[in-house]
Design a protein with these regions (language model features):
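Conserved active-site "lid/cap" helical segment
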Residues: 1-72, 76, 167-179, 189, ...
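Condensing-enzyme catalytic core mediating Claisen C-C bond formation in acyl metabolism
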Residues: 1-27, 146, 232-298, 302, ...
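Active-site-proximal alpha-helical scaffold in enzymes
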Residues: 87-119, 172-201, 263-270, 335-336, ...
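N-terminal extracellular/periplasmic Venus flytrap/periplasmic-binding protein-like
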Residues: 12-13, 24, 28-33, 44, ...
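Active-site pocket-lining segment
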Residues: 55, 169, 202-205, 213, ...
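Flexible glycine-/small-residue-enriched beta->alpha junction loops
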Residues: 112-170
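Conserved catalytic cysteine-centered active-site region
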Residues: 25, 57-112, 145-148, 158-164, ...
């Protein structure tokens, strides 16, 4: 019988706003924080036996450029014998890291893994390419925070290089997602986060971060700072379309540009017993799919269908559905295609990325983490986690409470 992969612990930083509380922390230092928290919460683990660290990171042009997973392990104080590798499936990187770690354990090639993701969009650098020829006076500078750079002309000709908000407007147009429905979706995200925060539902998954001050004691940062739980429909309706006044995607019904890191401790049953760990969830399976880049936000729909077919499970069996809210338009296009109601209580019951934020390489790991704790709070069995990915992909993963 093949071994199973169990999530034994999962923890994340609070998510910071662009230029906010976490913006003063180097990306590699940020990546180390949840690993340090895992080490502190699990003192019985022999950390020398961790087979690998797999981290997702979408940028990798700045302080995250030299294999940030390896950097994170060293900076966290793990033994030098513990290796690390960084994955890049853009927005899906963190989820891909978790699924890949689980696959290694299921294959019998590893017994104890750390997986997660990091992104500091605040600290994403500007980059400049070399000139095509000597003494050329041409130059270009790209902001690597999000979106296209170093554009391939053939890619542009064949598929277009629409910005992320443009792809969301493409989805809204193609699937006829009304502005009012997008704003209502965004409002639910904010309100559900507000209720979850008030009930203390994020305490188990968030590791407070100490922020050094110029004078006095460090500031303790322990709450996501992107949410706006007092948002109203009237306020959302006043916002202008990002891509033009006649279009429907706005700053209010889109996810944020954010900073954060997340790490999960994943083990086989035997390793969990050896290290005194209590399995919390089983990694059931993961699947990916491709769609046209111009409607990249629709990617979760085929990924979810592929995953359900692969596992023999149904949407009706899912007790929690964590759908990354890159944009309300794409979220609604996906849920409607899957036959789900817009206000299905299983979808992002504690709010989603429109409220919480979307640090690209971290978000997938955050979805799995949040889903796991929600299953334990409610006694549910299965959770489906899924997200869209730039350049036209989707990823989905199912976990089971144990």
């Amino acid at each position: 019988m093949n071994p199973q992969a169990f999530i034994c612990d999962a923890i994340r930083t609070p998510i910071g706003r662009y230029g906010g509380t976490l913006s003063g922390i180097r990306t590699d230092d940020l990546a180390a924080l949840p690993i340090k928290a895992l080490m502190a919460r699990n003192p019985g683990v022999n950390w020398e036996l961790v087979e690998d660290i797999i981290y997702g990171c979408a940028n990798q042009a700045g302080e995250d450029n030299r294999n940030v997973a390896r950097m994170a392990g060293l900076l966290a104080g793990l033994p030098v014998a513990v290796p690390g590798t960084t994955m890049n499936r853009l927005c899906g990187s963190g989820m891909d890291a978790v699924g890949t770690a689980a696959r290694a354990i299921k294959a019998g090639e590893a017994a104890l893994m750390i997986a997660g993701g990091v992104e500091s969009m605040s600290r994403a650098p500007f980059v400049m390419p070399k000139a095509d020829s000597a003494f050329s006076r041409s130059n270009a500078v790209y902001d690597t925070t999000i979106g296209w750079r170093f554009i391939n002309k053939l890619m542009k000709q064949q598929y277009g290089v629409d910005s992320m908000p443009e792809t969301a407007d493409n989805v809204a147009a193609e699937f006829r997602i009304a502005r009012t429905d997008q704003d209502a979706f965004a409002l639910r995200s904010q309100q559900r986060w507000g209720a979850a925060h008030a009930a203390g539902r994020f305490k188990d998954e968030i590791a407070p971060v100490e922020i050094a001050q110029k004078k006095g004691d460090p500031k303790i940062f322990d709450t996501d700072e992107h949410p706006r739980p007092d948002t109203t429909l009237e306020q959302l309706a006043k916002l202008k379309g990002i891509n033009g006044p006649e279009l429907t995607v706005t700053a209010g019904n889109a996810s944020g540009v954010n900073d954060g890191a997340c790490a999960l401790l994943i083990a086989s049953a035997a390793a969990a017993k050896t290290h005194g760990l209590t399995p919390k969830a089983r990694g059931v399976a993961m699947a990916t799919a491709g769609v046209a880049p111009r409607i990249m936000g629709f990617g979760p729909a085929p990924a979810v269908k592929k995953l359900l077919a692969q596992t023999g499970l149904t949407l009706a069996q899912m007790d929690v559905i964590e759908l990354n809210e890159a944009f309300a338009a794409q979220g609604l296009a996906v849920t409607r295609d899957l036959g789900l109601a817009d206000d299905d209580a299983r979808i992002n019951p504690n709010g989603g990325a429109i409220a919480i934020g979307h640090p690209l390489g971290m978000s997938g790991a955050r979805l799995v983490t949040t889903a796991m704790y929600q299953l334990h709070r409610t006694g549910g069995r299965y959770a489906l986690c899924t997200m869209c990915i730039g350049v036209g992909q989707g990823i989905a993963m199912i976990i089971e409470r144990v």
